Amino acid sequence: MSPMYYLYLSAVLFTLGAVGVLLRRNAIIVFMCVELMLNAANLALVTFSRINGNLDGQVMAFFVMVVAAAEVVVGLAIIVAIFRTRRSASVDDANLLKY
């Protein structure tokens, strides 16, 4: 299979994630779309790494996954805090978290 197909898949996944971030109001769905965008970037990094024949893209994808794991912890903690105070997971309620 040609590496270009992986780049096309990466572009489609990134676009779906970006559309989800822009159009959805539920914080959990937005969070999942951001993770989809990160995974699409990882797929592109690994594909470019394979095309060039070096491991730099794979190492960078590993570090992106480490940062994404930390993001999951912080993001879910914020979503739970919003849900506990407002009984809603809407991103519109995020500005009300300080009260």
From Swiss-Prot:
The chain crosses the membrane at residues 3-23, 28-48, 62-82. It is an enzyme of class 7 (translocase). The keyword rRNA-binding does not apply. It is a multi-pass membrane protein. Keywords: Cell membrane, Membrane, NAD, Quinone, Translocase, Transmembrane, Transmembrane helix, Transport. It is found in: Cell membrane. Belongs to the complex I subunit 4L family. NDH-1 is composed of 14 different subunits. Subunits NuoA, H, J, K, L, M, N constitute the membrane sector of the complex. This is NADH-quinone oxidoreductase subunit K.
